[in-house]
Structures are given as structure tokens and as C-alpha cells.
UniProtKB/Swiss-Prot annotation:
Comp. bias regions, Pro residues: 329-342
Glycosylation sites: 56, 86, 142, 226, 443
Stretches that traverse the bilayer: 463-483
Recorded family membership: Belongs to the alphaherpesvirinae glycoprotein G family.
Sequence repeats: 271-292, 308-329
Source organism: Suid herpesvirus 1 (strain Rice)
SUPFAM superfamilies (UniProt xref): Immunoglobulin
GO annotations of cellular component type: membrane; viral envelope; virion membrane
Function: Chemokine-binding protein that inhibits neutrophils' chemotaxis.
Compositional bias annotation for Acidic residues: 308-322
Localization per record: Virion membrane
The protein, known as: Envelope glycoprotein G
Amino acid sequence: MKWATWILALGLLVVRTVVAREAPRELCYGHPVHDDRRPVGPATDAQPVNPLAPANATGTDYSRGCEMRLLDPPLDVSSRSSDPVNVTVAWFFDGGHCKVPLVHREYYGCPGDAMPSVETCTGGYSYTRTRIDTLMEYALVNASLVLQPGLYDAGLYIVVLVFGDDAYLGTVSLSVEANLDYPCGMKHGLTITRPGATLPPIAPTAGDHQRWRGCFPSTDEGAWENVTAAEKGLSDDYADYYDVHIFRSESDDEVVHGDAPEAPEGEEVTEEEAELTSSDLDNIEIEVVGSPAAPAEGPATEEGRGAEEDEELTSSDLDNIEIEVVGSPRPPASSPPPPPPRPHPRGRDHDHDHGHHRADDRGPQRHHRLPPEPTFVSPSDIFVTPTGSPALLLGFLGSALASRPLHLTAGETAQHVREAQQKSRHIRSLGGLQLSVETETTNTTTTQTGLSGDIRTSIYICVALAGLVVVGIVIMCLHMAIIRARARNDGYRHVASA
């Protein structure tokens, strides 16, 4: 009985690990779909979001190919009171020393004992903050995170739900099959910008490999041209700025990259204090300075001057290179406005006027040290609010999926990923500009099966236990056979002696 109990428990563990949630097929389409639901305004940031709190619950998920995944919060709030509350939903990626914000949305007037949704929250919902990074986009379906994972998206995802004054934190560990033989290439993901990021060991392709696994609807580019950011559930000024924020905690040696403070009156930001952004690429001039090379002996000729102009730089010239940013100077960024006061629960019969939180991306970025103790910051201070045109906002962008005025899915993701993989990749690093050349390498010497470590470990344990049971049964059978053989021998001896 004890062995049976252990085997049953291990079987349930394996089932829990293997069960994965692929996004419903109705979310896979590449054309805009309108309905009557509209966000009521920008997020108020009245409920603090702390991704550093201890987890209340954990879960696992496993993705393969170009699937659209729907990560559900592994949290249960059914024991709460059903009284209406405002709810904030925020998803993060655990980057180790920092928690990378992915999406953020507020719901108003929601039942306190259920997950928020646009159907059940009578006060409406806010614009959605979403991160676009390294060919990957994220979206919310009510409280669940939608993404199309690549090899660099494997890791721990954090969800924070704030119901009134009560905060809940859950984690989902996502594993991704290590196989490149898919239309989307699989070489994308959030951690690809990390220094020294490398591909995991790639498993060989099996004979029954389903290469076209995933979401690949046809895309109507013309239908997306007139779609506004507000229709996607995003702020109206979404496409006008790219502002980088990140939330770090570990110690006061860590830094926060955020909006640069406004320069004091009478002072100007110097070039040494400014950091390059991607908009400076077109205004970069490279000049070689230092002592001019000695002219060659003899009279100068037109051919000689032409040869000097065509002369290539050598390694000795590297110490004499200056990079100068030319063009009109950029005005310093203005300080962001303070977050508005905590809102009251909203109803359909009340009008609310909201100003748009706008960050100026033209100012320089500076490094600011955190205080020794971790502090709460508003989501507007830790989220990436990127630029983009409607044609590049992939199918499941923003707040559109099955819960917003315009339903967008991951349908366009595969197409844009394939197109983007043919272009040079510009990688933004926090606090400055980093150019990276991607070298594609494939490791075919490994025999990894592509299963996650938890799955393999559970299977190995079950197989080992089953083997022990079989060995025990065999030993018992042999023991009984030996006893019977001895009994027969004793009987023969007794008959012979008689």
C-alpha cells in the first residue's frame, strides 16, 4: 500500500508538470476585430506593485515550436469576499538581479473573489502598458499572459495581483523545447540581449516532428494601417516615445535606469553626461585626430593625394579616433508628473477625465542609485513603453486579445519574426546603446530530448520505482520457487527413507 501511494503521488506530479496551456485557437487570427469595449483611461498607479515579495503559489508550463502560450496566474482568490474592489495585474520576467516588467493593467469594480476580466469588472479597465523587446511582444487576456516563446524566453515569470489592499504573487516556470526546426526559428526571446547569451543544447529533430506547430494566420496589413493605439487598449501617445525603466533591488550598488531628472536652472546637460540612443545613429561622425602623417618625399601629385585619401585606417589609428554626435542638441527630459491619487471604484454612469502620462525620450539617461532598502515604485516608473507603428504591432499586442475593443493575436508574430531575422538586429542596452552582431551556431552533438528537467526527473523516478517493484516481484517469485523445491526434495527423502 505504501508503494502504491508513492507511485500515485509521483504520477500526479508528472501530470501536473506535463500539463500545459496552449492559447485557444480563437485567439489565432491576423486581422483586427472590433467590439464595444474601450479602456477608460491611463493607469492611475494607485496600487503599489512589488515583484520582490515572496511567492504565494507556483506553477509550470512547457512550450514547443511557435505556439502561442497562455500563462495563467497560479493563484486562488475564491476565499476572498465578493465585495467589489479595484484590481491591478502585472507580469514580470525574473532576470535574477532585476525583475523585468512585461505587461500592466488596472481593472475597476471587480468581484473580490474572482480573477478580473473585462466582462465582470463593471468599472472598466485602464490602458495597458506592454513591453516590446527583441522581436517579442506580450499581451493580457484578463489576468493571463500571452506570448509566443522562443528559446530565450525560458525562465521564471512572476505575476502580481493586487485586490484592493491585498497583494498576491505567483510564479510560472516556463520551459521551451530546444529545437530550431520551426518556421519562427526559435532564436528569439527576452534574454537574448544579455551579455554572453548562448543557445541551449539543441536536441536532434525526431522523425515525427511537427514542424508547423503554432499559430500562422494570414495577415491583412491594410486593415492594420488605420488602427490607433487607443483601439489596441494602449495610451494615445504610445507610438511617440521609447522610455526604458527597470526595477532592481538587491543592494544599493544596483542602479535604476529611468527618466533623467530635469537639469537645474542655469545648467545644461553636457555631452559627457549624455548617453547615445538609437536616434543618434544617423548623426554619428568618426574623425581621426592627432599628429598628421609625414608627407612622402618628393613633390605632391594628384595621384599621391588620391592615394592618401584612399588609405585605410590601421590599428595604430584606433587610439586617435573620436566619435562625435552632430546635429541639433536635444533638450533635457522633463520630470514625469507624480502619480494621481488613489481612485474610487468606477461605475458606468460616471465620467472621468485622465491626463496621459508621457515620457520624453529625447533627454539623456542617467544612473540613479537605489536606497539601501527596496522601495515600492509606481508601475509607470518600471515599465517599458515602446514605440511602434500599427503595421509592426504584432497580432497579440497590447490589450486586444479577447478582452479589449480590438482583438489582436500572435498571428502576425511568426511573419514578423521571419522578416526581422533577415535584417540586422539592433540591441538596446539599458543606459546606453549597444550594437550586436548575432552569430548563428547549431550544436548537433547532444542527445538531449527537449524535455524539461522536472519532467525528465519525474519520469526517471517513476521508471526507477517501477523497476524496483518488478525486481521485488521477481525476488519473491524466486524465493517461493526455492521454498517449493526444498519441500519437494524433503518429500523425496522421506519416501526414500521409508
